[in-house]
């Protein structure tokens, strides 16, 4: 059916046996790694002969376990680029009655991430390297939308996981460009900088062949040949800025927490007394607090947004203390410019 309609057939198959069945049935794309055993040479040959594209999706399975166990790494990419509200829900469990949690979540919270994930990760890495070495078409994909794997922010994390399989940065860039285009049959239009192809281009400040994180250094975007400045694309609302600040606070990430504030930030108490001014004073005020209070968690009990002001009723767990208060955040030009704490 898909072939008759000139469509690619992508199949979810994570076991060697089901992957074999899928390819024999005409699958053009395997959208997950084979993770139950090392792929034998005859199947590697079959994948290459049939021009099957392999998308490893290395991080998605473990991200479920990280979320359910509460062992979130709070990767910088997530704190900076994931949907701020969606990411914030991952820590909602901290404010819940743990006795009411589903049994599966209780198990993860008690036992942590099972060791079998280590074996799965190892098998996936070995298979990925074997296929790349054999010349099988490998493309980047994250399966974003699953629990703990977010659109946009999961991309660099997937590349970092692929890098652990001993792939070169050039391998990773090919997987994200021309290989993906080949896999979906659109390499005549996109995937490489060639005459006659659509001019969809990222211009970077730093060389991604030196580090995949340099893909974050986007200077300009060209879409269909039209230049787009980055700062015209991502203009977060005041509420989004404050939510991203909250996520960094709950992650106890001092750098990304401070990054949501303007350099001349002023923080006042309810009587108008200036408590802190500027990033340096904020860092001095919060760094040790973040480091030492390992159970830190701020729950927003209520929120009101009025133009550029975000008013949060906050409940903070800090060690053995529970602190209640109201914070008024004033946002200008995408940064928190002023904070007033109300008793």
Predicted regions and their residues:
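Acidic, glycine-enriched loop/beta-strand segments at the rims
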Residues: 150, 168-173, 182-218
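A beta-strand edge to alpha-helix "cap/lid" segment located at domain peripheries
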Residues: 247-250, 268, 273-274, 281-343
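Short, well-ordered alpha-helical segments enriched in acidic and aromatic residues
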Residues: 251-268
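Structural recognition of alpha->loop->beta junctions
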Residues: 20-41, 158-171
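A cross-family glycoside hydrolase active-site/sugar-binding cleft signature
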Residues: 10-12, 31-33, 55-58, 141-143, ...
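Divalent metal-binding pocket/active-site signature
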Residues: 1-28, 36
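Divalent metal-coordination and catalytic microenvironments
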Residues: 2, 12, 30, 54, ...
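Active-site neighborhoods of metal-dependent hydrolases
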Residues: 39-165, 231
């Amino acid at each position: 059916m898909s072939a008759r309609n000139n469509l690619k057939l992508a199949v979810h198959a994570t076991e060697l046996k089901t992957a074999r069945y899928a390819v024999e049935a005409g699958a053009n794309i395997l959208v997950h790694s084979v993770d139950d055993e090392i792929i034998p040479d005859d199947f590697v040959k079959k994948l290459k002969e049939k021009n099957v594209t392999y998308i490893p999706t290395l991080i998605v399975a473990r991200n479920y376990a990280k979320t359910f166990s509460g062992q979130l790494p709070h990767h910088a990419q997530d704190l900076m680029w994931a949907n701020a509200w969606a990411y914030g829900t991952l820590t909602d469990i901290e404010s819940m009655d743990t006795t009411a949690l589903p049994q599966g979540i209780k198990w993860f919270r008690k036992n942590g991430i099972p060791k079998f994930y280590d074996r799965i990760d190892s098998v996936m890495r070995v298979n990925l390297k074997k296929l790349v070495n054999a010349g099988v078409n490998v493309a980047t994909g994250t399966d974003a939308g699953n629990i703990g794997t977010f659109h946009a922010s999961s991309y660099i994390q997937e590349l970092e996981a692929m890098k652990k399989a001993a792939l070169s940065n050039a391998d990773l860039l090919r997987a994200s460009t021309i290989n993906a285009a080949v896999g979906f049959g659109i390499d005549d239009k996109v995937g490489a900088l060639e005459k006659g192809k659509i001019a969809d281009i990222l211009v970077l400040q730093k060389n991604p062949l030196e580090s995949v994180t340099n893909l974050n250094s986007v200077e300009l975007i060209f879409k269909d040949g039209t230049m787009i400045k980055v700062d015209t694309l991502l203009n977060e609302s005041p509420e989004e800025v404050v939510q991203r600040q909250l996520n960094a606070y709950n992650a106890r990430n001092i750098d990304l927490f401070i990054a949501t504030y303007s350099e001349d930030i002023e923080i006042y108490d309810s009587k108008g007394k200036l408590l802190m001014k500027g990033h340096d004073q904020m860092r001095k005020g919060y760094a040790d607090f973040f480091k030492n209070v390992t159970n830190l968690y701020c729950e927003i009990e209520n929120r009101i947004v009025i133009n550029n002001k975000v008013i949060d009723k906050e409940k903070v767990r800090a060690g053995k203390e529970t602190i209640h208060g109201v914070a008024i955040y004033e946002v200008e030009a995408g940064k928190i410019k002023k904070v007033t704490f109300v008793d």
